[in-house]
Amino acid sequence: MSQATATQAKGIQLSDAALKHLLALKEQQGKDLCLRVGVRQGGCSGMSYMMDFEEPNRATEHDEVFDYEGFQIICDRKSLLYLYGLMLDYSNALIGGGFQFTNPNANQTCGCGKSFGV
């Protein structure tokens, strides 16, 4: 796993590799964007991770905003109950590459790593 950029005080941790990749994706879009992270019902294990870029002004009073060297992650408080302590990492490996979620709240995860159960 890559070195963490975030401090333990942040509810969602972000590795240096994930931050670097997110900044590159943001630059490709050519506008100011942040990453919204959340959960929804579904997936092999009961809950699925959600990630998408959005404009920072879309954050509401029901969201928590985490700043990583000028890049923001937004998470609604309900999802944060399931994601608190999550480590988001990135690997460019040919097999098993992409974003990887390490969730301390998950009692079970599926083989693909994109869903979990609590």
Curated annotation (Swiss-Prot):
Identify the InterPro entries for this entry. FeS_biogenesis, FeS_cluster_insertion, FeS_cluster_insertion_CS, HesB-like_dom_sf, ISCA_plant_cyanobact
UniProt-listed GO biological process terms? iron-sulfur cluster assembly
Its GO CC terms?
cytoplasm
Q: List the molecular function annotations (GO) for this entry.
A: 2 iron, 2 sulfur cluster binding; identical protein binding; iron ion binding
Q: Which Gene3D superfamilies match?
A: HesB-like domain
Q: Which PROSITE patterns match?
A: HESB
Instruction: Please name the Pfam families in this protein's record.
Output: Fe-S_biosyn (PF01521)
Where do transmembrane segments lie in this chain?
Answer: none
Q: Give the record's family classification.
A: Belongs to the HesB/IscA family. Ycf83 subfamily.
Q: What is this protein called?
A: Uncharacterized protein slr1417
Q: Which organism is it from?
A: Synechocystis sp. (strain ATCC 27184 / PCC 6803 / Kazusa)
